[in-house]
Amino acid sequence: MTDVATQTADILINGIPFSEFIKNNTIESDISDWDFLKDNSDTERDTDGDNDNENENESNNVDVCTNISPSLSEQDVQGLRESILYCIDESVRNNPLSFSDPTFHIKLENSIYEVIEYTFSDNSFTSIDIFAFTEEMENQIEEVITTCLEEYFETIVPPRSYPTTCILQPPNVAETVKKIEYLKSIPQDEQRTAGWYIFRNKLITASAAWKVFKSESCINQLIYEKCKPLAANITANSDDVDDIEREKDKEQIIVEKTFVNTNSPLHWGQKYEKLSVMLYEARNNTKVGEFGCIKHPKYDFLGASPDGINVDPVSPLYGRMLEIKNVFNREITGIPIEEYWIQTQLQMQVCDCDECDFLETCFKEYEDEAAFIHDSSSDIDAEFHLTSAKTLKGVIAYFMKDGKPFYEYAPLYLTREEYDRWCEEIIDKNAGITWLKNIYWYLNQYSCVLIRKNDIWFESAIKKIENVWNTILKERETGYEHRAPKKRTPKKKNNIPYEENTNESGCLIVISDLELNI
């Protein structure tokens, strides 16, 4: 049978710890009805009360095992199935927040096996143990458990995620049109603009809400970030300055303070986000629309900025949300990590989307154009866009505009002739700004999995989020300084004159810490 070594101590059933449940609420109530446990041993046991002979006891045990049916009858299977479905449902509904755990399904399955093992090894209510099962019976039990889990997560509650993206059913076009039109009608600032930062500061956003479900330290950090002023040097008092004017002051300061470290993982993700959208649209023959920061229609302290939503009415993906993560150095497993799973769930709730494609991409960059051109699958011009490993490659033109990075993305699947022409045309198109270089990329990994909206999880999660938000509102008035991170004593640095320190690295062009704090 499946290894049950995975810890299940954090699972509750009927509101009590799992370890207590399997002692007091196992499936023993159904055991008397299962034919494969009827060993007829009552007629074979010593009725004279003389059970001191060890050989007789061993003989009885052998008789019990030999009288076990070699397989489960249909009645046995049905009884087992009903009990397992009950255990699954109780576990899920008593542990809804556990869905965010990437090992959720493994823990749940192992807990079911543990119930079975404990039930049939407890001699207080059955005369056999699990090790007396035949191989055929073990296979039957394993098949029943697997089938029950599949049926439950197909019909009752959606699984945490699917192994890949897929179409479960065609979209309701009429209903989806109304949803998208409503989202478009909501006033919203473009992502990463000053107004966008200001609006997000008034909310707990989907991308930061994961901290609510982590340690006290993470919760403390979130409260501190939301309490402190958006820009440190804004000191305007609400009694002295009109609200609208104060918002304008904030916006101006934000614009002035927005610096972008082009070497950071954050900027890497932003740089390749549009390219990931292009790939997704091309692979799925769809169109992705952009949206700003949107507030939940009921819970006004919760907001989300989805990377996009499929807006092509003829696409089978119409209305499906898209969340993108451009991996810098993390392994892509196809299983969304906890922080990202929570983010997608909250985004779907805010935008009333039932499904989300969670896309992870990993791009690598060539050293120069020569390496880019050399890495080709063949000399055929039509395959110029393919690497020697048959993966996609392309080019991004990197400009500087108003002191900030600006990128132009070459169309996908270019021939060599089209590539040469695009490189010339893009320079002419942006003649008024500074061209820095071309970035030559290739696709190293592409993973897209489907995540469905989980209302059971959200019903429990929103209560915890609201509690933290109430604390934020309170401490904005009463004081939050006690939550400030403790300052570490800086290490002693060498006293090297600035003129002589010529080994500084990195390109700090123009991002403040605002995005990381919101």
Regions found by a protein language model. Give the residues of each.
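Accessory terminal regions of nucleic-acid processing enzymes
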Residues: 1-518
